[in-house]
Amino acid sequence: MTIKWVKSDPLVMNGEPFCYGSRLTVRQVLQARANGMTLVDMLKDHPELRVVGIAEAYAFAADNRDRYAEFFERNGSLAGPGYSAAEAARLPAQYRVPGIVVKAAKPAA
């Protein structure tokens, strides 16, 4: 069975896309990231979330940029801390997107 980590149901959370197995919307996950919450912080505060589920929420936002435009930096990356390279290494390849799921590389000085 394949799990769809981001779901949308008009009868749940007023139709706002949410993370499977939780009552957190994609918007709430993005707000937490923009406010500086790391992956470890999110999992500690919301143990019902899964590493791949959070990554899917970030990828969903990237695929729906118009809906979540306020969470994107000018360079196209999501605001706030992303996954470290070590954390992202455990994810399926389609989620290892620099600047979206994985922390954006710092520009060379």
Predicted segments, located by residue:
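Anion-recognition interface
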Residues: 21
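Long, charge-rich, low-complexity alpha-helical segments
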Residues: 24-109
